[in-house]
Amino acid sequence: MKITALEGQKISELSMIEVAHALLEQNGKEMQFSEIIRAIQDYLEKSDDEIKASISRFYTEINTDGSFIPLGNNVWALRSWYAIDEIDEEVIALDEIEDEEEEEKPAKKRKKVNAFGIEDEIDPEDEEGTKETTEEDMSYDTQAEDEDKDDVAAYDAELAEVELDNVDEEVDIEVEDDEDDSDDTDED
């Protein structure tokens, strides 16, 4: 691979940023970060281990260097190619493409796992896609009200049958006056 802008320079003295800049300038179009790394590795004749050791530093440099611009999806370009207004539009356009791709993928439904293994205690409110409650669903069940009244009447009848022991004894109940306590508070 030849980069014309770097001809005549010693390869061992070139930084990865210089090679990336010259590479993008020569190609004239944006590139994936992985493509940039492969091209730099080929041009500088570095081993995989050398590239792995310097990739984090290079990524930091490409982010902080003012001449590069990330366009999203790990695509990089030279800032000089874009007017300031156009940069925002380019990034927004790439974001919209990402959103469209995400919308096309069907959403995965996650199965809820019961950690206790008891399937009888499923909460119906946790179910997805439950229908909304309408006024008809909220109508009162008059039969249930009648059953409740019958239960109360039966309970009252049972209480009436119970004989109370020592009903005539008086029980002393002490009542504390709370009004005196409110005057004793300190206000600082």
From Swiss-Prot:
Pfam families: HARE-HTH
Domain HTH HARE-type residues, every copy: 14-81
Gene3D superfamilies linked to this entry: RNA polymerase, subunit delta, N-terminal domain
The keyword Nucleotidyltransferase is annotated on this UniProt entry: yes
Region of interest called Disordered, as start-end residue ranges on this chain: 96-188
GO cellular component: DNA-directed RNA polymerase complex
Highest taxon of the lineage: Bacteria
Comp. bias (Acidic residues): 118-150, 158-188
GO MF, one example: DNA-directed RNA polymerase activity
Subunit structure: RNAP is composed of a core of 2 alpha, a beta and a beta' subunits. The core is associated with a delta subunit and one of several sigma factors.
Family classification: Belongs to the RpoE family.
NCBIfam families for this protein: RNAP_delt_lowGC
Protein name as catalogued: Probable DNA-directed RNA polymerase subunit delta
Lineage: Bacteria, Bacillati, Bacillota, Bacilli, Lactobacillales
Record gene name: rpoE
